[in-house]
Regions:
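A generic hydrophobic-helix recognition signal that picks specific residues
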Residues: 24, 126-130, 178
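Short, solvent-exposed loop/turn segments at secondary-structure junctions
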Residues: 41-42, 84-87, 193-195
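Sec-dependent N-terminal signal peptides
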Residues: 2-12
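Short acidic, Pro/Gly- and aromatic-enriched capping/linker segments at domain boundaries
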Residues: 14-26
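Acidic/His-rich structured neighborhood in mature extracellular/periplasmic domains
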Residues: 37, 49-160, 203, 216
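Metalloprotease/metallohydrolase-associated module, dominated by Zn2+-dependent proteases
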Residues: 100-119, 125, 155-225
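Acidic/histidine-rich, surface-exposed loop or edge segments in extracytoplasmic proteins
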Residues: 26-49, 116
Length: 225
């Protein structure tokens, strides 16, 4: 092989699969650090402005309902906002190793990525507490720990009782609750209902009290309210 061609191939294969951190502009929104991809500030400015406006509104809402000490911990969680075809809407990234192995910037570890801003905007009406949901994942991971025994015990009870196997869904009818996927989703879904509104029953706090009173006690304990 031509040495120059070989060198070019090496350079190409050495390129990372992800956008470098230098491709983002750092902003402060409601006390949170937000990395905004520069394309959403230039080429797709309208999409970027609408996404950041909604994110700001959701973060403001969180500061109004979540107890202050918990908010201060949540504010340590960074956001990354961009168009990333690997992310349908928004997700929390707990693992640096997973990020590196799947073509994501490892610096997104312990951060929330809004990689599908179009869906983030489009799904806002039916999932108004999406940002809180992802922050609850971060809180579970970074503050409480995934081995938090009370959450695990309540999740185990929920699975064994089958009380979430067929619950009301916001569009009508009944479905298997998303909370049953694992104890992490259980905590995030119930946190949505605790502080606001979820798209699966229990939708709001009084319904948690009726449907899952032991988990209500846990939510009060871990969130400090």
């Amino acid at each position: 092989m031509n040495p120059l061609l070989l060198a070019a191939c090496v350079l190409v294969t050495a390129q990372p699969d992800f956008e470098p951190t230098s491709a983002y502009t750092v902003q402060a929104i409601e006390g949170w650090t937000v990395y905004v991809h520069n394309k959403l500030l230039t080429e797709k400015k309208d999409l970027g402005e609408r996404t950041l406006k909604l994110l700001g509104a959701r973060l403001y809402d969180i500061t109004r309902v979540v107890p202050g000490p918990a908010v201060e911990k949540l504010r340590k969680v960074r956001f990354w906002v961009e168009e990333n075809p690997k992310v349908a809407c928004a997700c929390y990234h707990p693992s640096r190793g997973w990020l590196a192995g799947n073509g994501f910037n490892p610096e997104k570890e312990k951060s929330i990525e809004i990689g599908g801003p179009g869906n983030f905007l489009g799904w806002a009406a039916c999932q108004p507490n999406m940002v809180l949901h992802e922050l609850a994942h971060a809180y579970h991971h970074q503050v409480l720990g995934y081995d938090q025994p009370d959450i695990k015990a309540c999740y185990k009870r929920a699975v064994e009782s089958k009380s979430y196997e067929s619950v009301l869904y916001y569009q009508g009818g009944k479905k298997r609750a998303y909370a049953l996927n694992n104890d992490q989703e259980y905590f995030a879904e119930l946190s949505e209902a605790y502080f606001g509104t979820n798209d699966f029953y229990p939708f709001v706090l009084p319904e948690i009290k009726e449907h899952d009173p032991e988990m209500l006690k846990v939510l009060q304990k871990v969130w400090g309210k």
